[in-house]
Curated annotation (Swiss-Prot):
This protein's name: Occlusion-derived virus envelope protein E56
Gene expressing this chain: ODVP6E
Functional description taken from the UniProt entry: Structural protein that is specific for occlusion-derived virus (ODV) envelopes but not of budded virus (BV).
Domain of life: Viruses
Organism annotation: Choristoneura fumiferana nuclear polyhedrosis virus
Additional facts recorded: Expressed late in infection.
Topology of the protein relative to the lipid bilayer: Multi-pass membrane protein
Carbohydrate attachment residues: N184
Regions that span the bilayer: 156-176, 320-340
Cellular component GO terms, alphabetical: membrane; viral envelope; virion membrane
Subcellular location: Virion membrane
Family assignment from sequence similarity: Belongs to the baculoviridae E56 family.
Keywords associated with the record: Glycoprotein, Late protein, Membrane, Transmembrane, Transmembrane helix, Viral envelope protein, Virion
Amino acid sequence: MSTFFTNLRRVNKVYPNQATFLTDNTRLLTTTPAGFTNVLRAPSTRNLGNGRFEPGYNLSNNQFVSAGDINRITRGNDVPRIRNVFQGISDPQIGSLNQLRRADNVPDAGLHVKRTRSDAVKQNFPETNVRSADGVDRALQQNPRLNTYLQGAKTAGVGVLLAGGAYLTFSAATLVQDIIQALNNTGGSYYVRGADGGDTADACLLLSRTCQRDPNMNTSDVVICNHDPLIADTAQLQAICSGFNYQQEQTVCRQSDPAADPDSPQFVDVSDLLPGQTIMCIEPYNLGDLIGDLGLDHLLGEDGLVGKSSNSSDSVSNKLMPLIWLIGAVLFLGLIIYLIYRFVIKGGAGAAGAARAPPVIVLPPPPTQQTYNSTKQQI
């Protein structure tokens, strides 16, 4: 049975002419859910030259969006970008894609959540953007709840599978060494197959598409693909990384990104893969990526800061001392100003007033009044 994501996957390729794309897009429209047809009804192509055309769609602002990008944002449930492309789409219409993804075991949404979470960790907690042993150790000390949790996992000896098919195992002498080993085993091109409605995924490393591996990668701790899902010819596979230059390409993979520019070495035509499968490039992890992958971001931040403040009272006092001195100086200055006003300015004004006052002449009272006043004063 033809499905939306099956037909959308079929147009994620380079076409020899525009007419063929229009035919495939007509089939796609028959399975397109409400809210998405307004864009997919406006097919267009970008001429790449040499009889090659990139399929895509013209938006209302005349902007071209490629079929690869449409695949990426809908498969990955990238809601902000979905709203940006499909103007006026409603929440229920976006939610309708969930069931369609589950029907085809599309794993991209879960992988997108991990990437988004990892990016947020690295942005909000820059101390986790490290790969060295010293950097990892400092980050753990700054986040004691995370440290405590991972130390407990190490004591239990429970290994964890990461998104890229590598494992965080607890077999080294220290937790920091365990983490460094896991980081060394990440990075490369991965063949991913969704299962359980896309909630889980099996991933393996495609060595021929991984053009730069960590020199300390232990392949025995990484799930390696026993075949390439698209290419069977050995010579063709060996040629993928020919002339690779990381400084220019800024990625460790080639032919591993279905949404890349078709003229770049990173583009891969996955139109022949089932919708529940994909090829993707994962750059080497740092600690922030690892935390996001494992969903441990809730162990960062506030509690770690509280722990630091309670265990480092001297540090807190040192930070507050300049403020205390400033407040004291302001109060002292205010006291000086008050004293000057009270005894100099106000006192001087009183003396001047006394000098200017007219003389007072006191007349002696009658004798009877004097006796009365004297008696009254004694009472």
